[in-house]
Amino acid sequence: MNIHRSTPITIARYGRSRNKTQDFEELSSIRSAEPSQSFSPNLGSPSPPETPNLSHCVSCIGKYLLLEPLEGDHVFRAVHLHSGEELVCKVFDISCYQESLAPCFCLSAHSNINQITEIILGETKAYVFFERSYGDMHSFVRTCKKLREEEAARLFYQIASAVAHCHDGGLVLRDLKLRKFIFKDEERTRVKLESLEDAYILRGDDDSLSDKHGCPAYVSPEILNTSGSYSGKAADVWSLGVMLYTMLVGRYPFHDIEPSSLFSKIRRGQFNIPETLSPKAKCLIRSILRREPSERLTSQEILDHPWFSTDFSVSNSGYGAKEVSDQLVPDVNMEENLDPFFN
Protein backbone atom coordinates (compact mmCIF):
# COMPACT_ATOMS: atom_id res chain seq x y z
CA MET A 1 0.00 0.00 0.00
CA ASN A 2 1.54 3.29 -1.08
CA ILE A 3 0.78 6.25 1.15
CA HIS A 4 1.91 9.79 0.46
CA ARG A 5 1.57 13.03 2.35
CA SER A 6 2.84 16.50 1.61
CA THR A 7 3.99 17.16 5.18
CA PRO A 8 5.90 14.78 7.49
CA ILE A 9 4.70 13.46 10.82
CA THR A 10 6.59 11.92 13.70
CA ILE A 11 6.31 8.14 13.85
CA ALA A 12 8.12 6.35 16.65
CA ARG A 13 8.84 2.64 16.55
CA TYR A 14 9.95 0.46 19.42
CA GLY A 15 12.60 -2.19 18.90
CA ARG A 16 16.14 -1.83 17.55
CA SER A 17 15.28 1.50 15.98
CA ARG A 18 13.69 2.91 19.14
CA ASN A 19 12.47 6.50 18.76
CA LYS A 20 13.14 6.42 15.03
CA THR A 21 11.00 8.91 13.10
CA GLN A 22 9.70 8.42 9.61
CA ASP A 23 7.69 10.48 7.15
CA PHE A 24 4.36 9.36 5.71
CA GLU A 25 6.16 8.46 2.50
CA GLU A 26 7.86 5.62 4.39
CA LEU A 27 4.75 4.24 6.06
CA SER A 28 4.38 1.37 3.63
CA SER A 29 7.64 -0.15 4.82
CA ILE A 30 6.90 -0.03 8.56
CA ARG A 31 6.55 -3.36 10.36
CA SER A 32 5.79 -4.28 13.95
CA ALA A 33 8.37 -3.93 16.69
CA GLU A 34 10.77 -6.53 18.00
CA PRO A 35 8.94 -8.78 20.50
CA SER A 36 11.75 -8.60 23.04
CA GLN A 37 11.18 -4.91 23.73
CA SER A 38 8.75 -3.70 26.38
CA PHE A 39 6.90 -0.39 26.35
CA SER A 40 6.32 0.25 29.99
CA PRO A 41 8.77 -0.21 32.86
CA ASN A 42 6.41 0.16 35.83
CA LEU A 43 2.98 1.46 34.84
CA GLY A 44 1.21 -1.64 33.66
CA SER A 45 0.53 -3.02 30.23
CA PRO A 46 1.04 -0.59 27.34
CA SER A 47 -1.94 -2.09 25.57
CA PRO A 48 -5.39 -0.81 26.60
CA PRO A 49 -7.83 -3.44 27.88
CA GLU A 50 -10.11 -5.14 25.37
CA THR A 51 -13.17 -3.58 27.01
CA PRO A 52 -13.26 -0.33 29.00
CA ASN A 53 -13.85 -0.67 32.73
CA LEU A 54 -13.17 1.13 35.95
CA SER A 55 -10.08 -0.97 36.62
CA HIS A 56 -8.25 0.28 33.54
CA CYS A 57 -4.58 0.72 34.40
CA VAL A 58 -2.66 3.83 33.49
CA SER A 59 -0.33 2.82 30.68
CA CYS A 60 2.91 4.39 29.52
CA ILE A 61 3.30 4.58 25.75
CA GLY A 62 6.58 6.25 24.84
CA LYS A 63 6.38 9.77 26.23
CA TYR A 64 2.62 9.57 26.88
CA LEU A 65 0.34 8.27 29.61
CA LEU A 66 -2.86 6.58 28.48
CA LEU A 67 -5.64 7.28 30.96
CA GLU A 68 -9.35 6.45 30.95
CA PRO A 69 -11.20 5.38 27.80
CA LEU A 70 -13.22 8.08 26.06
CA GLU A 71 -15.07 6.00 23.51
CA GLY A 72 -15.45 2.25 23.35
CA ASP A 73 -12.25 0.31 23.84
CA HIS A 74 -10.01 2.08 21.34
CA VAL A 75 -10.06 5.82 22.17
CA PHE A 76 -8.29 7.06 25.29
CA ARG A 77 -7.43 10.29 27.00
CA ALA A 78 -3.67 10.77 26.95
CA VAL A 79 -1.22 13.13 28.63
CA HIS A 80 2.29 14.06 27.51
CA LEU A 81 4.69 13.05 30.29
CA HIS A 82 6.88 16.15 30.06
CA SER A 83 4.60 18.99 29.01
CA GLY A 84 1.36 17.82 30.61
CA GLU A 85 -0.44 18.47 27.34
CA GLU A 86 -3.70 16.54 27.03
CA LEU A 87 -4.35 14.59 23.84
CA VAL A 88 -6.55 11.86 22.44
CA CYS A 89 -5.08 8.46 21.54
CA LYS A 90 -6.76 6.07 19.13
CA VAL A 91 -5.54 2.48 19.20
CA PHE A 92 -5.53 0.36 16.03
CA ASP A 93 -4.37 -3.15 15.24
CA ILE A 94 -0.92 -2.87 13.70
CA SER A 95 -2.08 -4.89 10.70
CA CYS A 96 -4.81 -2.47 9.63
CA TYR A 97 -3.92 0.99 10.90
CA GLN A 98 -2.52 2.11 7.54
CA GLU A 99 -5.77 1.22 5.81
CA SER A 100 -7.85 2.91 8.52
CA LEU A 101 -5.79 6.10 8.35
CA ALA A 102 -5.22 6.14 4.59
CA PRO A 103 -7.54 9.15 4.06
CA CYS A 104 -5.48 11.12 6.60
CA PHE A 105 -2.25 10.25 4.86
CA CYS A 106 -3.36 11.32 1.39
CA LEU A 107 -4.84 14.69 2.38
CA SER A 108 -2.83 17.84 3.03
CA ALA A 109 -3.22 19.59 6.37
CA HIS A 110 -6.16 21.92 6.98
CA SER A 111 -6.96 24.06 10.02
CA ASN A 112 -10.48 22.61 10.27
CA ILE A 113 -9.51 18.95 10.06
CA ASN A 114 -8.10 17.07 13.04
CA GLN A 115 -4.41 16.35 12.55
CA ILE A 116 -2.34 13.41 13.72
CA THR A 117 0.47 14.63 15.95
CA GLU A 118 2.34 11.36 16.39
CA ILE A 119 2.11 7.63 15.73
CA ILE A 120 3.80 5.06 17.96
CA LEU A 121 4.02 1.51 16.70
CA GLY A 122 4.05 -1.41 19.11
CA GLU A 123 4.20 -5.16 18.62
CA THR A 124 0.50 -5.57 17.90
CA LYS A 125 -0.99 -2.07 18.20
CA ALA A 126 -0.55 1.35 16.62
CA TYR A 127 -1.11 4.32 18.93
CA VAL A 128 -2.25 7.40 17.03
CA PHE A 129 -2.27 10.73 18.87
CA PHE A 130 -4.48 13.72 18.09
CA GLU A 131 -4.95 17.09 19.74
CA ARG A 132 -7.69 17.10 22.37
CA SER A 133 -11.13 18.58 21.76
CA TYR A 134 -13.65 20.57 23.78
CA GLY A 135 -16.94 18.89 22.95
CA ASP A 136 -18.82 18.25 19.72
CA MET A 137 -21.24 20.30 17.64
CA HIS A 138 -24.22 18.00 18.22
CA SER A 139 -24.02 18.41 21.99
CA PHE A 140 -23.39 22.14 21.62
CA VAL A 141 -26.47 22.74 19.45
CA ARG A 142 -28.57 20.54 21.72
CA THR A 143 -27.48 22.56 24.75
CA CYS A 144 -28.01 25.93 23.04
CA LYS A 145 -31.33 24.80 21.49
CA LYS A 146 -30.25 26.64 18.35
CA LEU A 147 -27.65 29.20 17.28
CA ARG A 148 -27.92 32.82 16.29
CA GLU A 149 -27.11 33.39 12.64
CA GLU A 150 -23.83 35.18 13.31
CA GLU A 151 -22.50 32.29 15.38
CA ALA A 152 -23.92 29.67 13.02
CA ALA A 153 -22.33 31.38 10.01
CA ARG A 154 -18.91 31.48 11.66
CA LEU A 155 -19.02 27.80 12.64
CA PHE A 156 -20.70 26.49 9.50
CA TYR A 157 -18.15 28.22 7.28
CA GLN A 158 -15.42 26.25 9.03
CA ILE A 159 -17.41 23.04 8.62
CA ALA A 160 -18.01 23.63 4.91
CA SER A 161 -14.36 24.61 4.46
CA ALA A 162 -13.24 21.26 5.88
CA VAL A 163 -15.61 19.38 3.57
CA ALA A 164 -14.54 21.41 0.52
CA HIS A 165 -10.90 20.64 1.30
CA CYS A 166 -11.69 16.93 1.47
CA HIS A 167 -13.60 17.04 -1.82
CA ASP A 168 -10.77 18.93 -3.51
CA GLY A 169 -8.36 16.32 -2.16
CA GLY A 170 -10.32 13.40 -3.58
CA LEU A 171 -12.20 12.30 -0.47
CA VAL A 172 -15.91 11.68 0.06
CA LEU A 173 -16.84 11.75 3.74
CA ARG A 174 -20.06 9.65 3.55
CA ASP A 175 -21.08 9.96 7.21
CA LEU A 176 -21.30 13.70 7.81
CA LYS A 177 -23.18 14.84 10.89
CA LEU A 178 -22.86 17.44 13.62
CA ARG A 179 -21.29 14.95 16.02
CA LYS A 180 -18.34 14.52 13.65
CA PHE A 181 -17.24 18.12 14.24
CA ILE A 182 -15.48 19.00 17.48
CA PHE A 183 -14.28 22.22 19.05
CA LYS A 184 -10.62 23.22 19.03
CA ASP A 185 -10.92 25.72 21.87
CA GLU A 186 -12.69 26.12 25.19
CA GLU A 187 -14.49 29.22 23.89
CA ARG A 188 -16.10 27.04 21.20
CA THR A 189 -15.33 29.40 18.36
CA ARG A 190 -13.23 27.06 16.19
CA VAL A 191 -14.25 23.63 14.94
CA LYS A 192 -12.57 20.77 13.12
CA LEU A 193 -13.60 17.50 11.53
CA GLU A 194 -12.88 14.85 14.15
CA SER A 195 -11.67 12.07 11.86
CA LEU A 196 -11.45 10.84 8.29
CA GLU A 197 -11.75 7.15 9.11
CA ASP A 198 -15.12 6.80 7.33
CA ALA A 199 -13.97 8.70 4.25
CA TYR A 200 -13.73 7.08 0.83
CA ILE A 201 -10.71 7.77 -1.37
CA LEU A 202 -11.77 8.51 -4.94
CA ARG A 203 -9.88 7.07 -7.89
CA GLY A 204 -9.89 9.95 -10.33
CA ASP A 205 -12.69 12.45 -10.90
CA ASP A 206 -15.57 9.99 -10.65
CA ASP A 207 -17.25 10.32 -7.24
CA SER A 208 -19.86 7.62 -7.81
CA LEU A 209 -20.63 5.46 -4.79
CA SER A 210 -23.11 2.64 -4.27
CA ASP A 211 -23.00 1.87 -0.54
CA LYS A 212 -25.66 2.91 1.98
CA HIS A 213 -23.23 4.36 4.49
CA GLY A 214 -24.51 7.19 6.65
CA CYS A 215 -26.81 8.41 9.40
CA PRO A 216 -30.61 8.25 8.93
CA ALA A 217 -31.29 11.89 9.81
CA TYR A 218 -28.58 13.11 7.43
CA VAL A 219 -28.95 10.72 4.49
CA SER A 220 -29.81 12.15 1.07
CA PRO A 221 -32.87 11.17 -1.03
CA GLU A 222 -30.85 9.58 -3.82
CA ILE A 223 -29.21 7.14 -1.41
CA LEU A 224 -32.68 5.97 -0.37
CA ASN A 225 -34.13 6.00 -3.88
CA THR A 226 -31.48 4.31 -5.95
CA SER A 227 -30.18 0.78 -6.11
CA GLY A 228 -27.29 1.92 -8.26
CA SER A 229 -24.66 4.61 -7.83
CA TYR A 230 -24.94 8.21 -6.66
CA SER A 231 -22.65 11.23 -6.34
CA GLY A 232 -20.75 10.97 -3.07
CA LYS A 233 -19.90 14.66 -3.00
CA ALA A 234 -23.51 15.71 -3.62
CA ALA A 235 -24.62 13.39 -0.80
CA ASP A 236 -22.07 15.06 1.49
CA VAL A 237 -23.49 18.45 0.53
CA TRP A 238 -27.01 17.29 1.46
CA SER A 239 -25.69 16.31 4.89
CA LEU A 240 -24.19 19.80 5.19
CA GLY A 241 -27.64 21.22 4.54
CA VAL A 242 -29.12 19.10 7.32
CA MET A 243 -26.39 20.33 9.64
CA LEU A 244 -26.98 24.00 8.77
CA TYR A 245 -30.74 23.70 9.18
CA THR A 246 -30.31 21.99 12.55
CA MET A 247 -27.88 24.65 13.77
CA LEU A 248 -30.27 27.47 12.86
CA VAL A 249 -33.62 25.90 13.67
CA GLY A 250 -32.80 23.53 16.54
CA ARG A 251 -34.31 20.42 14.97
CA TYR A 252 -33.69 18.24 11.94
CA PRO A 253 -35.43 19.27 8.71
CA PHE A 254 -36.77 15.70 8.43
CA HIS A 255 -37.73 13.93 11.64
CA ASP A 256 -39.84 10.98 12.69
CA ILE A 257 -39.44 8.26 15.29
CA GLU A 258 -40.24 5.60 12.68
CA PRO A 259 -37.40 5.08 10.17
CA SER A 260 -39.79 4.23 7.32
CA SER A 261 -41.72 7.48 7.85
CA LEU A 262 -38.48 9.44 8.16
CA PHE A 263 -37.18 8.02 4.88
CA SER A 264 -40.46 8.84 3.13
CA LYS A 265 -40.12 12.48 4.20
CA ILE A 266 -36.51 12.60 3.02
CA ARG A 267 -37.44 11.06 -0.35
CA ARG A 268 -40.05 13.77 -0.88
CA GLY A 269 -37.51 16.42 0.09
CA GLN A 270 -40.13 18.72 1.57
CA PHE A 271 -39.35 20.75 4.68
CA ASN A 272 -40.36 24.01 6.31
CA ILE A 273 -38.05 26.92 7.05
CA PRO A 274 -39.09 29.22 9.91
CA GLU A 275 -39.81 32.81 8.97
CA THR A 276 -37.46 33.91 11.74
CA LEU A 277 -34.45 33.13 9.54
CA SER A 278 -32.96 35.81 7.31
CA PRO A 279 -33.56 35.69 3.53
CA LYS A 280 -29.91 34.82 2.87
CA ALA A 281 -29.97 31.96 5.36
CA LYS A 282 -33.16 30.60 3.79
CA CYS A 283 -31.58 30.91 0.36
CA LEU A 284 -28.50 28.93 1.38
CA ILE A 285 -30.53 26.16 3.00
CA ARG A 286 -32.77 25.83 -0.07
CA SER A 287 -29.73 25.85 -2.36
CA ILE A 288 -28.23 22.90 -0.48
CA LEU A 289 -31.27 20.78 0.37
CA ARG A 290 -32.31 20.25 -3.25
CA ARG A 291 -33.90 16.91 -3.96
CA GLU A 292 -32.04 16.68 -7.28
CA PRO A 293 -28.29 16.22 -6.58
CA SER A 294 -27.17 18.12 -9.68
CA GLU A 295 -29.07 21.22 -8.52
CA ARG A 296 -27.26 21.49 -5.18
CA LEU A 297 -24.40 23.85 -4.58
CA THR A 298 -20.99 22.23 -4.40
CA SER A 299 -19.05 22.43 -1.15
CA GLN A 300 -16.84 25.12 -2.69
CA GLU A 301 -19.84 27.12 -3.92
CA ILE A 302 -21.28 27.06 -0.41
CA LEU A 303 -18.24 29.02 0.79
CA ASP A 304 -18.96 31.75 -1.76
CA HIS A 305 -22.56 32.27 -0.66
CA PRO A 306 -23.37 35.88 0.37
CA TRP A 307 -24.80 34.75 3.72
CA PHE A 308 -21.25 34.46 5.07
CA SER A 309 -20.44 38.07 4.15
CA THR A 310 -23.49 39.46 5.97
CA ASP A 311 -22.72 42.20 8.46
CA PHE A 312 -24.75 40.76 11.30
CA SER A 313 -24.04 43.78 13.51
CA VAL A 314 -26.12 46.04 11.27
CA SER A 315 -28.54 43.47 9.86
CA ASN A 316 -31.68 42.36 11.61
CA SER A 317 -30.25 40.92 14.82
CA GLY A 318 -33.56 39.29 15.64
CA TYR A 319 -33.07 36.53 13.11
CA GLY A 320 -32.74 33.21 14.85
CA ALA A 321 -33.45 34.61 18.31
CA LYS A 322 -36.87 33.04 18.87
CA GLU A 323 -36.87 30.06 21.19
CA VAL A 324 -37.53 26.59 19.81
CA SER A 325 -40.66 25.04 21.27
CA ASP A 326 -40.61 21.52 19.82
CA GLN A 327 -38.55 18.82 18.13
CA LEU A 328 -35.22 19.59 19.77
CA VAL A 329 -32.16 17.84 18.41
CA PRO A 330 -32.39 14.33 19.90
CA ASP A 331 -29.58 12.90 21.93
CA VAL A 332 -29.23 9.56 20.14
CA ASN A 333 -32.45 8.69 18.28
CA MET A 334 -31.30 9.28 14.72
CA GLU A 335 -27.55 8.98 15.21
CA GLU A 336 -27.30 5.32 14.28
CA ASN A 337 -25.85 4.04 11.04
CA LEU A 338 -27.99 3.21 8.03
CA ASP A 339 -26.69 -0.33 7.73
CA PRO A 340 -29.38 -2.08 9.87
CA PHE A 341 -32.16 -0.59 7.75
CA PHE A 342 -30.83 -2.05 4.50
CA ASN A 343 -29.73 -5.51 5.62
Curated annotation (Swiss-Prot):
Limits of the Protein kinase domain: 61-308
UniProt region (Disordered), positions on chain: 25-50
Any Pfam family hit: Pkinase
Entry-linked CDD domains: PK_TRB2
Compartments, record wording: Cytoplasm; Cytoplasm, Cytoskeleton
Record's keyword annotation contains Cytoplasm: yes
InterPro entries per the UniProt record, alphabetical: Kinase-like_dom_sf, Prot_kinase_dom, Tribbles/Ser_Thr_kinase_40
Keywords: Cytoplasm, Cytoskeleton, Protein kinase inhibitor
Gene Ontology MF, one: mitogen-activated protein kinase kinase binding
Gene3D superfamilies, A to Z: Phosphorylase Kinase, domain 1 (3.30.200.20), Transferase(Phosphotransferase) domain 1 (1.10.510.10)
GO biological process, one term: regulation of MAP kinase activity
Annotated Gene Ontology cellular component terms: cytoplasm; cytoskeleton; nucleus
Polar residues: bias regions: 29-45
Summary of the tissues where the protein is detected: Highly expressed in the thyroid, also present in ovary and cerebrum.
Family under the similarity heading: Belongs to the protein kinase superfamily. CAMK Ser/Thr protein kinase family. Tribbles subfamily.
Role summary: Interacts with MAPK kinases and regulates activation of MAP kinases. Does not display kinase activity.
Description of its domains: The protein kinase domain is predicted to be catalytically inactive.
The name this protein goes by in its record: Tribbles homolog 2
